[in-house]
C-alpha cells in the first residue's frame, strides 16, 4: 500500500515559510521518511488600488500589493515517528499548513 502525505504551506512572508519548510525536511530526514520537495508553487499576487483623497483628486491613487507564497512537500510512506513529530510541530503565526493523505 503506497501512501503519500501532502503538506501544503502558505504564507505572506517567504522567510517564515522557508524556515518552516526546513524544519519539516529535518524532521523527515531524522525519522527516515522519503521526501519529495519542497516544490515552490506559483505566488499569488493581489493588487489593491485606493484613492488617496477622501473627496476629489481621483487621479491620485495608491496601490498596495499582497503576495501569497506557497510550497508543497510530499512524504512517501510516512513513518509513524514522522507523523507524531509533525503533530507536535509548532508552526509560527503567519504560516498556514494543510495536510492531505
UniProtKB/Swiss-Prot annotation:
Disulfide bonds: none
SMART domains referenced in this protein's UniProt entry, alphabetically: Ribosomal_S10 (SM01403)
GO cellular component, one term: ribonucleoprotein complex
Biological process, per Gene Ontology: translation
SUPFAM superfamilies: Ribosomal protein S10
Keyword Aminoacyl-tRNA synthetase: no
Family annotation (InterPro entries): Ribosomal_uS10 (IPR001848), Ribosomal_uS10_dom (IPR027486), Ribosomal_uS10_dom_sf (IPR036838)
Claim: Endoplasmic reticulum is one of the keywords in the record: no
Keywords carried by this UniProt record: Ribonucleoprotein, Ribosomal protein
Molecular function in Gene Ontology: structural constituent of ribosome; tRNA binding
Family label: Belongs to the universal ribosomal protein uS10 family.
Cited NCBIfam families: PRK00596.1, rpsJ_bact
Function: Involved in the binding of tRNA to the ribosomes.
Summary of subunit composition and partner proteins: Part of the 30S ribosomal subunit.
Name used for this protein in its record: Small ribosomal subunit protein uS10
Organism: Ureaplasma parvum serovar 3 (strain ATCC 700970)
Gene name, Swiss-Prot/TrEMBL: rpsJ
Amino acid at each position: 500500500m503506497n501512501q503519500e502525505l501532502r503538506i501544503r504551506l502558505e504564507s505572506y512572508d517567504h522567510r517564515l515559510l522557508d524556515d518552516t519548510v526546513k524544519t519539516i525536511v529535518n524532521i523527515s530526514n531524522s525519522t527516515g521518511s522519503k521526501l519529495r520537495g519542497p516544490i515552490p508553487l506559483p505566488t499569488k499576487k493581489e493588487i489593491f488600488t485606493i484613492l488617496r483623497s477622501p473627496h476629489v483628486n481621483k487621479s491620485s491613487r495608491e496601490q498596495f500589493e499582497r503576495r501569497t507564497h506557497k510550497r508543497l512537500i510530499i512524504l512517501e510512506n510516512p513513518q509513524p515517528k514522522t507523523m507524531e513529530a509533525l503533530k507536535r510541530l509548532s508552526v509560527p503565526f503567519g504560516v498556514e499548513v494543510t495536510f492531505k493523505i
